[in-house]
Amino acid sequence: MSVSKPSVILSRRDMLSLAAGVACAGVLPASFARADVRPETFSSSEIVDNGHRFFGSVTRGLAEGVESANKRWGKPNAYILGQEGSGAFVGGLRYGEGTMYTRNAGKRPVYWQGPTIGIDAGLDGDRTMMLVYNLPEVEGIFRRYSGVDGAAYLIGGVGFTALNNNEVVVIPVRTGVGARLGMNLGYLKFTPEKTWNPF
């Protein structure tokens, strides 16, 4: 006499719950682990190539500026591509938003605030690239950075201004008129969410 095995019938809700559980088990631990992983570095050529695509032109100044920064601070282990403008100039401050990219720790949106000068108010929609050096982890970008003495320079129409907070160095890279005005940048504050508070 054979004994039939009981059949298991899963409802649609059970199947969706099971699928969600499997997805969470496979994804969430990895994403949390990446949050405190130290990002690996990028080569100069990778940064320059991404910069050329981002700004839409090939400039000698970008390559020379990146090489100069790398000689002083090593290789960047993150970079930010973003935009400032679209009504972002309020009370003498500049606001921006973008995405920070890393080689092995993923990417995430970032927002920043910093001072500007009067004639800067007409520059709507400036594209800005930022190089990040010595970033200990992805969340470590969220600090306030002050200017580094003697670390603002203009090469071939591309402006570089170094800012730091302890070991982490952030270098905004701008072209055209924004390159010259970026030299006056006194500080930048990065936040995980958009805010109008610059302090």
Region annotations inferred by a language model:
Residues 1-14, 18-30:
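N-terminal secretory signal peptides
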Residues 31-35:
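Sec/Tat signal peptide C-region and signal peptidase I cleavage site
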Residues 36-199:
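Small-residue-enriched, tightly packed secondary-structure blocks
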